[in-house]
């Protein structure tokens, strides 16, 4: 999935982690800087082989632990928290950042005189919920008033063939890791 602010590039660094849904909330009381909360729901590997799924799991753990913060800092983001947990039998990865400047036109976000627009870059994403307005002429673009205190949307991505094999493995590996961390 290719959503702006380079958020998903950070999470999907290995290129084989996928999620069924992504929710992004940008809290902007008073403008910049903003607080960005991204939640990826039902993470799974795009691989079917157990060893390859394990590699993707290891990448997820590195992302969770914040081992690759240099990319985030380069795009003006400061990581505040990362949470990895199981909810309703699904792996969820929630990241919270401070974003110095919301106007990132290269990543699909534009702050104009009267509105903020965000154009999703992946045609496969379906916008399933937003507090903005989806443009009828371009169903991949969402707009909000410039002074909106919160920008929020949720997208759904089609599940890939590897989902049925890798999702249960990923859930079990996360459960095991979280149990080990509690010891």
Which residues are covered by each model-predicted region?
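Post-signal peptide N-terminal segment of mature Sec-exported envelope proteins
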Residues: 23-43
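N-terminal start-of-chain detector that recognizes signal peptides
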Residues: 9-10, 63-70
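Sec-dependent bacterial lipoprotein signal peptides
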Residues: 1-14
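Bacterial signal peptide processing site
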Residues: 15-19
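Hydrophobic residues positioned within well-ordered beta-strands of beta-sheet architectures
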Residues: 22, 35-38, 80, 93-95
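Intrinsically disordered, low-complexity acidic/polar segments
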Residues: 33, 46-47, 104-106
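Post-signal-peptide N-terminal segment of Sec-exported extracytoplasmic proteins
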Residues: 37-64, 130-141
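Mature, soluble, non-transmembrane domains
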Residues: 68-183
């Amino acid at each position: 999935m290719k959503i702006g602010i380079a958020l998903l590039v950070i999470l999907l660094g290995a290129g084989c982690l996928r999620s069924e849904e992504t929710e992004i909330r940008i809290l902007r009381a008073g403008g910049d800087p903003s607080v960005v909360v991204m939640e990826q729901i039902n993470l799974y590997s795009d691989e079917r082989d157990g060893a390859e799924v394990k590699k993707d799991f290891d990448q997820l753990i590195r992302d969770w632990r914040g081992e690759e913060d240099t990319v985030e800092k380069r795009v003006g983001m400061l990581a505040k928290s990362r949470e990895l947990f199981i909810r309703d039998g699904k792996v969820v990865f929630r990241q919270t950042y401070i974003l110095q400047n919301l106007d990132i036109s290269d990543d699909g976000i534009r702050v104009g005189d009267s509105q903020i627009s965000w154009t999703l870059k992946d045609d496969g994403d379906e916008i399933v919920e937003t507090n903005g307005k989806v443009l009828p002429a371009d169903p991949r673009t969402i707009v909000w008033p410039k002074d909106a205190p919160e920008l929020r949307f949720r997208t759904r991505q089609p599940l890939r063939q590897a989902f049925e094999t890798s999702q249960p493995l990923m859930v079990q590996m996360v459960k095991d890791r979280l149990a080990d961390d509690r010891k």
